[in-house]
UniProtKB/Swiss-Prot annotation:
The C-terminal region binds to PDZK1. The lineage of its organism: Eukaryota, Metazoa, Chordata, Craniata, Vertebrata. One of its GO terms (biological process) is cholesterol efflux. The chain crosses the membrane at residues 12-32, 440-460. Residues 1-11, 461-509 are cytoplasmic. It comes from Sus scrofa. This is Scavenger receptor class B member 1. Signal peptide: none annotated. One of its GO terms (molecular function) is low-density lipoprotein particle binding. It comes from the Eukaryota. Coiled coil: none annotated. Glycans are attached at N102, N108, N173, N212, N255, N310, N330, N383. N-glycosylated.
Amino acid sequence: MGSRSRARQVAAALGFVGLLLAALGAVMIVMVPSIIKQQVLKNVRIDPSSLSFNMWKEIPVPFYLSVYFFDVINPNEILQGQKPQVRERGPYVYREFRHKSNITFNDNDTVSFLEYRSYQFQPHKSRGLESDYIVIPNILVLSASVMMEDRPMSLKLIMTFAFSALGERAFVNRTVGEIMWGYEDPLIHLINKYFPNMFPFKGKFGLFAELNNSDSGLFTVFTGVKDFSRIHLVDKWNGLSKVNFWHSDQCNMINGTSGQMWAPFMTPESSLEFYSPEACRSMKLIYKEQGVFEGIPTFRFVAPNTLFANGSVYPPNEGFCPCMESGIQNVSTCRFNAPLFLSHPHFYNADPVLAEAVSGLHPNTEEHSLFLDIHPVTGIPMNCSVKLQLSLYIKSVKGIGQTGKIEPVVLPLLWFAESGAMEGETLQTFYTQLVLMPKVLHYAQYVLLALGCVLLFIPIVYQIRSQEKCYLFWSSSKKGSKDKEAIQAYSESLMTPAPKGTVLQEARL
């Protein structure tokens, strides 16, 4: 009797525990998604208490700038009107360091900051040295010539004389370091003397001179602390709500983020918008596919075919015109009116006429398309490679002898890939806090519910089995009683004397 009582108590205890576990599992199924969402919102907003704040402030991801130059093989022939021939040189790789300063939190749920960048050459990652010589178009001479095309002949003749006096030619042979970070040029000194605010270059001219050890402008972005719906969106850049480089309000709009983080909880219908000070415009990337980076699920976003399309192909881009062939963007209005063009490397995704006009170009998707891999739950980039090309429109200009007989052509100068991937301790912390723990909680809720249901069945099964035993005992007891009554009745019948006249028959075996 004691063992049966203990079994009943154990079964009841297990049932009670099962009830608690099942209830906890059910509550978790209802509450965990909300808890995870709140934790994500808490940790991705721009707030000193958030997990991602230090990541936002001092980007721990190693970024690399890989630069490829187009070495002009036949400069003299180009001056005679022949087709340009180029050879790709590089990559010349630089480690890019970024840090934010002057961080100021404002009362309207925004934060203002300056982000400084610096670059260090990485010989072990490069295919060549900064001392390598490259033949490129003389950007100052050829761009100034195109800009002066419609000016009076007298001015063009004066310019020809000035170029000759300063020893300026249509093509220059300079080292990688000089092209990147600047070289002394007498024309720059002359311009700075008489037109001091015309160029940002002080004494030296270099394609990346203005980027090294400098900031990309004063960004003011929404923190998401008070209003999650606007998290990371740019409110102003250099105090402006829109720029004035282009010819339409839509093209002048500052849309999206500053290009480092995006709103969490993305779907395949989401897009990535960001403002690029270097391109002087907002850009929009579209969803392509799901993927996995180091065990972390990602969404890959790529450039649409319309990113650099001209106005005739994609009317919303009409504001970026005057346009040439589709696939290149005229950035002259934000680059001192120099005839510079932005595009994908090797004129990938552009009108084939552009690549066919220059020998040595081989556009392909694998090498020349850009992408960003984003963790969709947090909106944080895991892996990215942004690739862009800078080209110069050159042509013969009547009255300027240095331009010779150059046929009109958009000649590539260089292309670069700005790449970075999360790694090391940062990757491990991110994976543990924002991927592994939510995954553990997700599975734990169903395990608890299933285990609770199993334990709940124990007292039920015990009760059923106990009732069966009682029924069997009662049935066997009742049957035994009937048998005893039958035997007793039979015995009494044998002991009773037979009535007179009854003949007893002999029992035979």
